[in-house]
Every structure is written in structure tokens, then in C-alpha cells.
């Protein structure tokens, strides 16, 4: 079966995503606190390297969630910044060795080779797929060495949902943060050691009681686009070719108490059924 195209906003500007990835066969590979601590650390380091801003995250026993912000511009990442990010990801020594390597290449007239290497690094920035690839490579090395594990850690590709800003972003952030409460692991989200939520940029527009977010909402966790109908339609139009061969099903998210839509790729006969 052909893989479904990942929904990602292209071009310059700001976009937000909800990302979720599970352990292989839903096994409790991350059950120990030390493993979850390392998972969170790898998320932070991979995000800093990739230029991704974390809005919320939670590490659970067999999966994790992230809400993140991606800002894309025409301004290339400067060499000093590239080295700073490499230091975050791989350590100061690795960054120092890379800087020395680039200097040596420049001294023998191989500036083009330096530009090519830096270009490959820049291509890994500000992209959720590259962010997840960097994170999983980093975490996998530690996990397999620490746990003497030889099997597959992750269950296929990660799931991602493109989300609108403002209240939709805030809803996803709170939904992610409440995961340990929904799972019965703690009574208050703030008591869970492996989750975090950023303070909102501005007051939350349109209150959503937390008890509503205690219900699992498929459009947040499994949809492809989450936001107002205007946002969803505009994104579907902008993404164009990815949707022409498929139908798009709109489902109203009534549990959240205000008008919003979660859209996902669906079969034609499913799309004809209307809101669920």
C-alpha cells in the first residue's frame, strides 16, 4: 500500500504541528523514568538543532506527543549558528572538530565543499520530518546501547497533524499536557515529571473546560489538519496535488464546545457520510 503523503506547510511563514509516535507493537519500552528522561532530553536537543520550538510535550510508557512551532524564512542559518546547534546535538568537541575541518578545507581552496556540507546541515532545519529523524537517531543510539536492545523501537512513521494557531494550538497543547491524567497516571498534569506546556502567547480565546479535553478526540490525535473550516479549506487548496487523488472528510469536533473542524484523508464513501 502506498504511503499517505504527510501534510506539511511549505514556503515561508509559521506553522504548528501535533506529532505522535508509538513504540513498536505498543510495547512499554519507555516505562522506566530514566528512559522517559532520556527521551525528553533527546526531543529537546533535536528540536534545538532543527530550529523547532516546542510548545508542549509528554513522554508516556509506549508513546510520546509533541506540539511544536516551525518558522521558515529565506534567511540561511549562519555558520556560527550551525556550529552552536551541532554542539547542542553532538557536544562541544564534535562542533570544534567540524569547525576545524571546515577551516582546513578553506585553506586548501575547497570552499565549495564547505558550502555543500553546510547546505546539507541547513536542509535539516525547520522541518518536522527532519526533526523526527534527528530525534529518533539520537534516542535510538542511546536506547539500544543502554538497554542492549536489538529490535525495532518505533511503530512505523510518526503521525502528524497540521494545526491552526490561537485557540486550536492552545487546545492541542492542553490536550497533550493532560495525557497522563487521562491515562490515570496522576491526578494533576503538573505532577507528571515528563511533560511540559509553554505559557500561551496571549489569553486563551474561547474557554474549553478541561473535562472536555479528558475525552480522546480523534481529530487532534489522528487528523491531518486541525483548525477552523476556513483554515482547513485554505490549507487543502494550498497543498493541492496531495489531495486531488483522494477525498477529504470534514468532521466537526463537537466535544470542544466551539465550532472547529478536524479534517483527514478518507475514502470517498466515508466522506459522503458527513460529520461524525
Residue positions per predicted region:
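Short Pro-Cys-Gly-centered "Cys-loop" motif that presents a nucleophilic cysteine in a tight turn
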Residues: 1-61, 69-276
Amino acid at each position: 500500500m502506498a504511503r499517505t503523503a504527510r501534510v506539511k506547510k511549505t514556503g515561508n511563514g509559521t506553522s504548528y504541528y501535533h506529532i505522535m509516535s508509538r513504540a513498536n507493537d505498543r510495547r512499554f519500552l519507555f516505562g522506566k523514568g530514566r528512559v522517559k528522561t532520556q527521551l525528553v532530553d533527546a526531543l529537546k536537543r533535536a528540536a534545538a538543532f532543527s530550529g523547532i520550538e516546542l510548545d508542549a510535550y509528554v513522554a508516556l510508557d509506549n508513546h510520546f506527543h509533541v506540539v511544536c512551532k516551525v518558522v521558515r524564512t529565506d534567511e540561511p542559518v549562519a555558520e556560527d549558528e550551525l556550529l552552536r546547534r551541532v554542539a547542542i546535538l553532538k557536544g562541544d568537541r564534535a562542533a570544534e572538530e567540524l569547525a576545524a575541518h571546515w577551516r582546513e578545507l578553506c585553506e586548501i581552496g575547497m570552499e565549495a565543499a564547505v558550502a555543500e556540507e553546510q547546505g546539507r546541515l541547513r536542509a535539516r532545519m525547520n522541518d518536522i520530518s527532519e526533526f523526527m529523524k534527528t530525534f529518533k537517531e539520537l534516542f535510538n543510539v542511546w536506547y539500544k546501547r543502554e538497554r542492549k536492545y536489538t529490535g525495532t523501537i518505533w511503530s512505523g512513521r510518526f503521525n502528524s497533524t497540521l494545526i491552526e494557531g490561537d485557540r486550536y494550538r492552545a487546545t492541542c497543547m492542553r490536550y497533550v499536557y493532560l495525557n497522563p491524567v487521562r491515562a490515570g497516571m496522576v491526578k494533576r498534569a503538573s505532577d507528571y515529571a515528563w511533560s511540559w506546556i509553554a505559557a500561551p502567547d496571549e489569553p486563551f480565546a474561547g474557554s474549553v473546560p478541561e473535562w472536555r479535553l479528558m475525552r480522546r478526540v480523534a481529530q487532534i490525535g489522528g487528523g491531518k489538519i486541525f483548525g477552523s473550516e476556513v483554515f482547513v479549506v485554505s490549507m487543502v487548496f494550498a497543498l493541492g496535488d496531495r489531495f486531488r487523488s483522494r477525498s477529504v472528510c470534514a468532521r466537526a469536533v463537537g466535544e470542544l464546545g466551539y465550532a472547529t473542524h478536524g479534517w483527514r484523508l478518507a475514502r470517498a464513501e466515508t466522506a459522503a457520510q458527513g460529520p461524525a
